[in-house]
């Protein structure tokens, strides 16, 4: 940055290059507001040959610790006056001050120009008391190469500073300055204030010792950006020209003592440089170094000084180098546009208005003091949407944005540690707070008051989206058996005129797998998402029974049947029960309707077989397939069928003789036997009947009933083809296991027919079946079951038949061997 412009009157003279820093503070001693007209005198240019590092260490960063003579932990409160503290600095100790600024505490990176103050060179500082009094001291010519702004401490009637030259390496940690009460001046130091101004305002600055600063000009410039922020941050949130530098009771100033012009690219835009020393990179006060963040942010106590003057230097209108933009920001991404907007070229000169305009703005500032105090107490440490006009704490231009002054002063882009420092003296008098509150502040979200709670209540409590199983588990309310479980269905039969169904009781042992559809989660009255409650929402045409989990639901069966109908028959291959029974979609829907109308358990068993809920023998499945499941149910229930019955079932119904002493199944079996024998030999209807009877004889329940028709079936062994013989032999093989029918089965006529099957022309399967039949009867004879059942039973026919059977078996074996090896047979 080149030399600073010095303005005399209302005309700026850029040729002036002062090396002084002027900082004034108006000390409020009475209730009446005091407005001091700043006096401006031209400054003598600096004659330093080398450009020293002139960034001043802001007391808000260095935090000079004021060892008060009052009791530790207490705070002096004086109505209408700033608290006085007889301060004595301890040599060798790191200075430490309170973070509260007088009148309107501003965050460390904010500077707000106040109307009525006239810029003076590069070193600009306006003192503003907590009640709106502004004063600018009359600066005498003092060749102070570097100075540190110091909070106003009234000791007696005047304050004289005494500097000690220390090593710059330990300047920040061990810089000592003793403040003595008196009116005599120190030798070698010219007074900064006039005689009548010094008594009212006190000393705001003290000369900072410079040991090796002139020897490290270049390194100081390179390290100047290592300020209170980390190195990745933009060193300027918003470019401040020298005319706009303005703070309320904690202003900064920076001296440019270098006479030669040297452009600065990355060192010019400062936010708040802590120090201009060459050891800035290793500064223990540097932000995010990890060891001094508490010293930088937290207010130590209420009894300390309430202001931290800060350093602000900025001549350029905007960044001179684009490298400044890439650095990260303190603020949210949404604030980038506000912070980095380019300023108009005329904007730096907007503050150079005539004195009439500035006087008017001074009056407005005094009138807005009550508003300012409220803004100071509240602060603006919220998110971007709260204080976007403040531009993240950066000071706005006086003439362009006069309304944002209060928000900018009270604003802060830091976290909640700085909120206690925004209260200033007005906050001390309005709201006394605990020491912990001043130290820690509020760690909560916006609109929370600064408080210290060891167990704070969070703003938002995360709740589980899913219900805890233990909450729903209630063993006392759970059903003990399936009989206690009732499900009420809503089938579509009501629209067809059928009576309303009663609640269906699931039988014991049945597995429940009814479809459940969870309703979408609804938002409660408070906008919080409620747990989704699964409610039973069964479709109207759904089959009102529970299925085993291994089987498909009604909707899945519907989709499967529709897919089968849309596919080509030759391309469709499926082994499910519906495909095996050849149930169509229309027939399946009729079956569901019948299930709602009929309560007969036997009909329900047939329907369960068709649905895949019950396993059945191959005979039963074949019978249902050949007759049709709907036609079969309608025939059994004597319901008028809505379809044309199959010829097989129709003939069975009409031709069946009345059997009043037999149940429905026995009557049906008798009808099947008579229908099978009555059909022509080897006809499809006869084969269907034989297949049905073969499956019916798997169990012994109907053996005696079917044995009455054995003579007719034996006749088929002599007249039928190989396929017919196979089905007849399979049925007789099932009967051979039962001793009750063995006498009829192994009669003399039957044995001769069986022996006649042992020939070379008979198929191997049929011969194997006959052999198994003789083995079964042999086992029955050996067990003695035949003699127990029938005393008149004779074994002679069986013995002769067995001998003949053995001879035929040997001859058959020889014939089979000869067919396999013709040469050996010859």
Curated annotation (Swiss-Prot):
Gene3D superfamilies tied to this protein: Leucine-rich Repeat Variant
Residues the record lists as Phosphoserine modifications: 275, 277
Compositionally biased spans, kind Basic residues: 248-264
GO biological process, alphabetically ordered: hematopoietic stem cell homeostasis
Keyword Transcription regulation: no
Cellular component terms per the entry's GO annotation: cytoplasm; nucleus
Entry coiled-coil feature ranges: none
MF term (GO), any: G protein-coupled receptor binding
Role noted for this protein: May play a role in regulation of a variety of G-protein coupled receptors.
Assembly notes: Interacts with cytoplasmic tails of a variety of G-protein coupled receptors such as muscarinic acetylcholine receptor M1/CHRM1 and calcitonin receptor/CALCR.
Similarity-based family: Belongs to the GPRASP family.
Descriptive protein name: G-protein coupled receptor-associated sorting protein 2
Taxonomic path: Eukaryota, Metazoa, Chordata, Craniata, Vertebrata
Name of the gene encoding the protein in the UniProt record: Gprasp2
């Amino acid at each position: 940055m080149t030399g600073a412009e010095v303005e005399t009157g209302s005309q700026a003279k850029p040729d002036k290059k002062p090396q002084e820093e002027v900082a004034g503070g108006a000390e409020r001693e009475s209730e009446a507001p005091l407005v001091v007209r700043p006096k401006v005198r031209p400054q003598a240019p600096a004659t330093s040959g080398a450009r020293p590092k002139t960034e001043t260490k802001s007391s808000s960063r260095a935090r000079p610790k004021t060892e008060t003579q009052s009791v530790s932990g207490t705070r002096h409160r004086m109505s209408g006056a700033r608290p006085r503290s007889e301060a004595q600095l301890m040599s060798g100790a790191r200075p430490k001050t309170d973070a509260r600024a007088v009148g309107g505490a501003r965050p460390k990176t904010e500077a707000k120009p106040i109307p009525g103050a006239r810029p003076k060179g590069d070193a600009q500082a306006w003192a503003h008391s907590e009640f709106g009094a502004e004063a600018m001291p009359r600066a005498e010519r003092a060749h102070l190469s570097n100075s540190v702004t110091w909070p106003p401490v009234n000791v007696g009637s005047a304050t004289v500073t005494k500097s000690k030259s220390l090593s710059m390496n330990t300047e920040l940690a061990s810089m000592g300055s003793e403040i003595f009460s008196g009116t005599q001046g120190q030798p070698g130091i010219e007074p900064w204030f006039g005689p009548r101004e010094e008594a009212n305002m006190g000393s705001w600055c003290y000369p900072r010792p410079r040991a090796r600063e002139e020897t490290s000009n270049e390194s100081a410039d390179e390290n100047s950006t290592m300020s209170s922020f980390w190195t990745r941050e933009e060193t300027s949130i918003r470019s401040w020209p020298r005319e706009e530098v303005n703070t309320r009771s904690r202003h900064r100033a920076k001296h440019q003592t270098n006479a030669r012009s040297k452009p600065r690219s990355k060192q010019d835009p400062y936010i708040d440089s802590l120090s201009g020393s060459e050891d800035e990179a290793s500064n223990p006060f540097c932000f995010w170094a990890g060891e001094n963040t508490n010293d930088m942010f937290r207010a130590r106590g209420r009894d300390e000084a309430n202001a931290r003057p800060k350093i602000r230097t900025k001549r350029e209108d905007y960044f001179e180098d684009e490298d400044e933009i890439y650095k990260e920001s303190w603020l949210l991404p949404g604030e980038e546009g506000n912070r980095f907007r380019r300023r108009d070229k005329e904007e730096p000169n907007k503050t150079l208005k005539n004195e009439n305009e500035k006087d008017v703005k001074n009056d407005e500032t005094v009138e807005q003091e009550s508003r300012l105090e409220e803004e100071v107490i509240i602060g603006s440490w919220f998110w971007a949407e709260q204080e976007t006009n403040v531009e993240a704490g950066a000071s706005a231009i006086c003439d362009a944005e006069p309304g944002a002054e209060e928000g900018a002063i009270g604003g802060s882009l830091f976290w909640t540690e700085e909120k206690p420092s925004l209260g200033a003296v007005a906050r001390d008098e309005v709201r006394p707070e605990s020491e912990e509150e001043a130290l820690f502040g509020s760690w909560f979200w916006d609109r929370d008051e600064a408080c210290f709670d060891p167990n704070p209540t969070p703003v938002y409590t995360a709740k589980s989206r899913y219900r805890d199983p233990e909450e729903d588990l209630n063993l006392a309310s759970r059903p003990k058996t399936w009989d206690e479980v009732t499900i009420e269905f809503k089938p579509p039969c009501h629209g067809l005129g059928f009576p309303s169904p009663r609640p269906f009781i699931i039988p014991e042992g049945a597995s429940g797998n009814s479809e459940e559809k969870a309703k979408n989660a609804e938002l409660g009255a408070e906008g919080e998402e409620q747990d989704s409650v699964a409610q039973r929402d069964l479709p109207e045409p759904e089959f009102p029974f529970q299925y085993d989990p291994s089987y498909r639901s009604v909707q899945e069966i519907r989709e499967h049947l529709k897919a089968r109908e849309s596919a080509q028959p030759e391309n469709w291959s499926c082994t499910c029960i519906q495909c095996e029974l050849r149930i169509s979609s229309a027939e399946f829907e009729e079956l569901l309707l019948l299930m709602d109308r009929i309560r007969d358990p036997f009909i329900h068993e047939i329907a369960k077989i068709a649905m895949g809920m019950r396993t059945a023998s191959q005979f039963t499945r074949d019978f249902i397939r050949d007759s049709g499941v709907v036609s079969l149910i309608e025939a059994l229930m004597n319901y008028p069928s809505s379809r044309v019955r199959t010829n097989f079932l129709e003939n069975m119904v009409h031709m069946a003789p009345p059997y009043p002493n037999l149940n429905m199944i026995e009557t049906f079996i008798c009808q099947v036997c008579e229908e099978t024998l009555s059909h022509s030999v080897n006809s499809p209807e006869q084969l269907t009947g034989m297949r049905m009877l073969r499956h019916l004889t798997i169990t012994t329940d109907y053996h005696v009933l079917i044995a009455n028709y054995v003579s007719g079936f034996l006749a088929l062994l002599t007249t039928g083809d190989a396929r017919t013989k196979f089905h007849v032999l399979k049925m007789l093989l099932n009967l051979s296991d039962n001793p009750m029918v063995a006498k009829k089965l192994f009669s003399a006529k039957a044995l001769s027919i069986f022996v006649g099957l042992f020939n070379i022309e008979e198929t191997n399967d049929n011969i194997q079946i006959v052999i198994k039949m003789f083995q079964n009867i042999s086992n029955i004879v050996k067990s003695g079951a035949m003699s127990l059942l029938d005393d008149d039973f004779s074994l002679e026919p069986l013995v002769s038949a067995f001998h003949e059977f053995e001879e035929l078996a040997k001859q058959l074996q020889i014939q089979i061997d000869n067919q396999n090896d013709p040469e050996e047979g010859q």
